[in-house]
């Protein structure tokens, strides 16, 4: 099994010290099964070698991708990463690979599916909760309510869960082919999944990798790994059939 971790350059430089890396290892992955990737890898990246993709947090998605101009000074974009990840997502979807999105990853997935974002929550809305917490990243600050009992998220949690909150943007208009599976108490989208038949596409607005010591948050990564191992088994089966032929 091999999983691509699409991260910011500074996160990639952390290697095995990255919280994403550590969370997946804690959930049962081996370090050899994980490969951090970023835009400079685009020329040689072969998705045939992977069984799942995690889209991590980081910079804001360029508003041009959802038909808007940048309106606020605190919107910090990385166009190269946007282009790289949208192509990576497109190819992963074509191959029906398991996909996990976290924070920016959730927003990027929504935009790729035709949705839009609040460019800055404090400017575009009047949130009742603090969505960019000042405390430790490993602290939970508010609850999210699960909205779809048939979702993978609902099968992982029971009714609601407490999360950290480290974002100044959020989903505004939902992308086509996605469904909301959780929202915050003030109505913001906190999680989405594929609305149609797809092996596994889950994206959450919070940062579960910073909460991986909590059993319920670790289950998100365990579920993702399970789906990746299933994809790996299918790939091995196809390879075996090809050799027999």
Residue ranges and their predicted role:
Residues 103:
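Conserved G/P- and acidic residue-centered "switch" motifs that form tight phosphate/ATP-binding loops
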Residues 106-108:
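Hydrophobic, aromatic-enriched interface-forming segments
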Residues 202-205:
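Active-site-proximal beta-strand elements of phosphoester/diester hydrolases
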Residues 1-100, 110-112, 118, 122-150, ...:
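N-terminal beta1-alpha1 cap of cysteine-dependent amidohydrolase-like domains
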